[in-house]
Amino acid sequence: MTSKTVTRADLASVVCRKVGLSHTESAALVELVLNEICNSLVRGEAVKLSSFATFQVRKKNERVGRNPKTGVEAPILPRRVVTFKAANVLKQRILDSHRARQKIISHE
């Protein structure tokens, strides 16, 4: 498994190469898409990208937490968190890739 992290710049480079936009235009397009996803989530809307994933904002209620070092209880305030649920198509693609890699390793 690789430890590479894909960045905004990496995405912009792929758009530049595959779509034919300039690097500046590609970076602006990536930024526009990410901003729209963020804005939708801020408004409380779910973002569903077919065959990829669904992002949703979930409300978490107040609860009591505990400091793991001291054991002292402390309230955890209510908040909103973003959840990511991978689509079955993405899950299967990752599983297939993992199985193919395992098959190659076992035949070496």
Curated annotation (Swiss-Prot):
<comment type="subunit">
    <text>Heterodimer of an alpha and a beta chain.</text>
</comment>
<keyword id="KW-0233">DNA recombination</keyword>
<dbReference type="GO" id="GO:0006355">
    <property type="term" value="P:regulation of DNA-templated transcription"/>
</dbReference>
<dbReference type="InterPro" id="IPR000119">
    <property type="entry name" value="Hist_DNA-bd"/>
</dbReference>
<dbReference type="InterPro" id="IPR020816">
    <property type="entry name" value="Histone-like_DNA-bd_CS"/>
</dbReference>
<keyword id="KW-0810">Translation regulation</keyword>
<comment type="similarity">
    <text>Belongs to the bacterial histone-like protein family.</text>
</comment>
<dbReference type="GO" id="GO:0009893">
    <property type="term" value="P:positive regulation of metabolic process"/>
</dbReference>
<dbReference type="InterPro" id="IPR005684">
    <property type="entry name" value="IHF_alpha"/>
</dbReference>
<dbReference type="Pfam" id="PF00216">
    <property type="entry name" value="Bac_DNA_binding"/>
</dbReference>
<keyword id="KW-0238">DNA-binding</keyword>
<dbReference type="GO" id="GO:0005829">
    <property type="term" value="C:cytosol"/>
</dbReference>
<dbReference type="GO" id="GO:0003677">
    <property type="term" value="F:DNA binding"/>
</dbReference>
<dbReference type="GO" id="GO:0030527">
    <property type="term" value="F:structural constituent of chromatin"/>
</dbReference>
<protein>
    <recommendedName>
        <fullName>Integration host factor subunit alpha</fullName>
    </recommendedName>
</protein>
<keyword id="KW-0804">Transcription</keyword>
<dbReference type="GO" id="GO:0006417">
    <property type="term" value="P:regulation of translation"/>
</dbReference>
<dbReference type="InterPro" id="IPR010992">
    <property type="entry name" value="IHF-like_DNA-bd_dom_sf"/>
</dbReference>
<dbReference type="GO" id="GO:0006310">
    <property type="term" value="P:DNA recombination"/>
</dbReference>
<comment type="function">
    <text>This protein is one of the two subunits of integration host factor, a specific DNA-binding protein that functions in genetic recombination as well as in transcriptional and translational control.</text>
</comment>
<keyword id="KW-0805">Transcription regulation</keyword>
